[in-house]
């Protein structure tokens, strides 16, 4: 069975939907961890209620984005991560996470991507 780690910043409604879909076997995987960048996010309460481990980590506690993401990758190393789902994670993912989990990250995005200048989407982190 595949292991999913979900990243969220807010209410966690998408996180909860993913967990429930896994529990109902709609998705053949297990959510093994929630990574949350906001200590007051409602997603943390959802994780506790659903029995999912939560790793709360604030980028404000680090000197650089690299240091922040390196700490996350060190945490993830203790899991067999098959997929990272960015579900309401309100940060642009940097090179440290992208290179370590290349081809294993998907994003749910509330924006209409055509609203971004197509020639600049990758540069600004929209895709």
Q: Where are the regions a protein language model picked out?
A:
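One-carbon transfer enzymes
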Residues: 1-127
């Amino acid at each position: 069975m595949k292991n999913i780690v979900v990243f969220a910043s807010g209410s966690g409604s998408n996180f909860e939907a993913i967990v429930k879909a896994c529990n109902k076997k709609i998705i053949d995987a297990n959510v093994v961890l929630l990574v949350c960048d906001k200590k007051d996010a409602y997603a943390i309460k959802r994780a506790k209620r659903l029995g999912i481990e939560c790793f709360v980590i604030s980028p404000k506690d680090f000197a650089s984005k690299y240091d922040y993401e390196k700490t996350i990758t060190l945490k993830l190393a203790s899991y067999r991560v098959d997929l990272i789902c960015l579900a309401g994670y309100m940060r642009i993912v940097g090179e440290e996470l992208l290179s370590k989990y290349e081809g294993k990250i998907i994003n749910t995005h509330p924006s209409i991507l055509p609203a971004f200048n197509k020639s600049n989407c990758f540069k600004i982190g929209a895709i």
